[in-house]
Curated annotation (Swiss-Prot):
CDD domains: Ribosomal_L11. It comes from the Bacteria. Part of the ribosomal stalk of the 50S ribosomal subunit. Interacts with L10 and the large rRNA to form the base of the stalk. L10 forms an elongated spine to which L12 dimers bind in a sequential fashion forming a multimeric L10(L12)X complex. The keyword Lyase does not apply. This is Large ribosomal subunit protein uL11. The gene is rplK. Forms part of the ribosomal stalk which helps the ribosome interact with GTP-bound translation factors. One or more lysine residues are methylated. Belongs to the universal ribosomal protein uL11 family. PROSITE patterns: RIBOSOMAL_L11.
Length: 142
């Protein structure tokens, strides 16, 4: 078994799927850890090609020999809610002004997608977490 590599950094970014490039925010974040930026961009774009149009969070683990591994997460709940509601952005004053409505079925569908990243034991709990996010964005859940 190979000796374990020493981790020197953990970088968390949210990048459009299939559109990572060396420009900010990707370049500076990776550059300060000495990672080969183009190598990451090519690997990320290849891994997220099928999900174009979504923002995909990524966790990059950097090792002392400047190599890296990355793990893709599910799109942020807020982005999925905006897409389901068909609006560009949430409300500026969420508890006064409501901008859209989503059904419980849509919330459950988003919860199914996000299940692996949420701290919930079953779909009902996950749906409540997503509904809370919707409420704080000024989206009504019916």
């Amino acid at each position: 078994m190979a000796p374990k590599k020493k981790v020197t950094g953990l970088i968390k970014l949210q990048i459009q799927a299939g559109q990572a490039n060396p420009a900010p925010p990707v370049g500076p974040a990776l550059g300060q850890h000495g990672v080969n930026i183009m190598e990451f961009c090519k690997a990320y774009n290849a891994a997220t090609e099928s999900q174009r149009g979504n923002v995909i969070p990524v966790e990059i683990t950097v090792y002392e020999d400047r190599s890296f591994t990355f793990a893709l997460k599910t799109p942020p709940a807020a982005k999925l809610l905006l897409k389901a509601a068909g609006v560009q952005k949430g409300s500026g004053e969420p508890h006064k002004t409501k901008v859209a409505k989503v059904t419980w079925d849509q919330v459950r569908e988003i919860a199914e997608t996000k299940k692996s990243d949420l701290n919930a034991n079953d779909i009902d709990q996950a749906a409540k977490i997503i509904a809370g996010t919707a409420r704080s964005m000024g989206i009504t859940v019916e």
